[in-house]
Curated annotation (Swiss-Prot):
Pathway: Glycolipid biosynthesis; lipid IV(A) biosynthesis; lipid IV(A) from (3R)-3-hydroxytetradecanoyl-[acyl-carrier-protein] and UDP-N-acetyl-alpha-D-glucosamine: step 1/6. One of its GO terms (biological process) is lipid A biosynthetic process. Involved in the biosynthesis of lipid A, a phosphorylated glycolipid that anchors the lipopolysaccharide to the outer membrane of the cell. GO terms for cellular component: cytoplasm; membrane. PANTHER family: ACYL-[ACYL-CARRIER-PROTEIN]--UDP-N-ACETYLGLUCOSAMINE O-ACYLTRANSFERASE, ACYL-[ACYL-CARRIER-PROTEIN]--UDP-N-ACETYLGLUCOSAMINE O-ACYLTRANSFERASE, MITOCHONDRIAL-RELATED. InterPro entries: Acetyltransf_C (IPR029098), Acetyltransf_C_sf (IPR037157), Hexapep (IPR001451), Hexapep_transf_CS (IPR018357), Lipid_A_LpxA (IPR010137), Trimer_LpxA-like_sf (IPR011004). One of its GO terms (molecular function) is acyl-[acyl-carrier-protein]-UDP-N-acetylglucosamine O-acyltransferase activity. It is found in: Cytoplasm. The keyword Mitochondrion does not apply. This is Acyl-[acyl-carrier-protein]--UDP-N-acetylglucosamine O-acyltransferase. The keyword Hydrolase does not apply. Belongs to the transferase hexapeptide repeat family. LpxA subfamily. The lineage of its organism: Bacteria, Pseudomonadati, Pseudomonadota, Betaproteobacteria, Burkholderiales. It comes from the Bacteria.
C-alpha cells in the first residue's frame, strides 16, 4: 500500500500508485501522477502538471515540476514527463515546459541524475544518460540516449548533445556535440572543444570494431581535414553510401545530426 509519512503533504487530487512511498516533509501537488514503485525522499517537492512513471527514486530536497525560469511564463499549464527507473538525487531541479516550445520537459528511462543537477524548461532527455553532480542544462536542450555530462558542466540553451556523446567536467558547451563524440574544455579555458570519438563508451555498449572505425573516419573528415562543414558532411554521406548494414546505422545517426544543427557544432 502507499506509504505516506505523516508529515508529508499530498494533495487529495494527486494520483499515486498503490505502492508509492513519500518521505517526511515532502509535498505532492494536485496535478501530479506517480507510478508504481516510485519512492519520493524527504523534503522533496513534486508539483505542476507532472507525470512520473514506475520504479523511480527521487532523493531529498529535490524540486520536480517547478515553474520555468523564463520571464515569458504566465502560469500556463505546461508539463513535465518522467519515465521509468530513473534515479534523481538530492537537490536536483527539473522544471516544466513553456508554451513558446512544446510546453513539455521530458526525461526518459533509466537515467542517473546526480546531486544538484538542473534540467531547465523544455529540455528533452533520452534514456540511459548520466548527469554528474552540478551538471546544468539550460532551456530547450536535447540530450540523446547514453550521453554523459561531467560534473559542473554547463550547457547553453537550444544546444543538442548527441547519443553516446560525452561532455567533460567543468566544460561550457555553446554548440552541438555530434553523437559518439567527446567534448571537453582545454587548457585555454572552459569552452568545450572536440576530443575524439567516445571509443571506450562505444565498446562498453557493444559497438563492434567496424562501426567504431567508421565513426573515427567520419570524425577525421569533420574535424581533421581541411574540408568545410558542408564538404565534410557530403563526404561522410558518401561514406555512408559505401557502408554495409552493420556500419550504416551509426553513420546515419551522425549524418542526420549534422544536417539538423541550428547552432553549429563544437569546434
Amino acid at each position: 500500500m502507499t506509504q505516506i509519512h505523516p508529515t508529508a503533504l499530498v494533495d487529495p487530487k494527486a494520483e499515486l500508485a498503490s505502492d508509492v512511498t513519500v518521505g517526511p516533509f515532502s509535498i505532492v501537488g494536485p496535478n501530479v501522477r506517480i507510478g508504481s514503485g516510485t519512492r519520493v525522499g524527504s523534503h522533496t517537492t513534486v508539483e505542476g502538471y507532472t507525470t512520473i512513471g514506475e520504479g523511480n527514486t527521487i532523493g531529498p530536497y529535490a524540486s520536480v515540476g517547478g515553474v520555468p525560469q523564463d520571464m515569458k511564463y504566465r502560469n500556463e499549464p505546461t508539463r513535465l514527463e518522467i519515465g521509468d527507473r530513473n534515479t534523481i538525487r538530492e537537490f536536483t531541479t527539473i522544471h516544466t515546459g513553456t508554451v513558446q516550445d512544446r510546453g513539455l520537459t521530458s526525461l526518459g528511462n533509466d537515467n542517473w541524475i546526480m546531486a544538484y543537477v538542473h534540467i531547465a524548461h523544455d529540455c528533452t532527455v533520452g534514456n540511459h544518460t548520466v548527469f554528474s553532480s552540478n551538471a546544468q542544462i539550460a532551456g530547450h536542450v536535447e540530450v540523446g540516449d547514453w550521453a554523459i555530462l561531467g560534473g559542473m558542466s554547463g550547457v547553453h540553451q537550444f544546444v543538442r548533445i548527441g547519443a553516446h556523446a560525452m561532455l567533460g567536467g567543468a566544460s561550457a558547451l555553446v554548440q552541438d556535440v555530434p553523437p559518439f563524440v567527446i567534448a571537453a574544455s582545454d587548457k585555454s579555458g572552459n569552452k568545450a572543444t572536440p576530443h575524439g570519438v567516445n571509443v571506450e563508451g562505444l565498446r562498453r555498449r557493444g559497438f563492434d570494431a567496424g562501426q567504431i572505425a567508421a565513426l573515427r573516419q567520419a570524425y577525421k573528415l569533420l574535424y581533421k581535414s581541411d574540408l568545410s562543414f558542408d564538404e565534410a558532411r557530403n563526404e561522410i554521406t558518401a561514406l555512408l553510401g559505401q557502408s554495409d548494414a552493420g556500419t550504416a546505422a551509426p553513420l546515419r545517426a551522425f549524418v542526420d545530426f549534422l544536417a539538423a544543427t541550428q547552432r553549429g557544432i563544437v569546434r
